[in-house]
Amino acid sequence: MNTTEVMETASDLLDGVIYDAEAFSVQDCQYIADLLASQGYALRVKPEFSLVYAVPEQVH
């Protein structure tokens, strides 16, 4: 994934889009997770359902 694709994917995730986990490499997920974290969100992966989605970070 290039930088533009990572940014577009992160934006889609913030908009509530759910992706197939098989579409991303581990490195792609790390880049996306870092970008989401900067926006106060966390990347969640549910391998048993092959889903990738964003959730708001918990405030402690």
Predicted segments with their positions:
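Compositionally biased amphipathic helical and low-complexity segments enriched in hydrophobic
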Residues: 14-15, 36-37, 44, 52
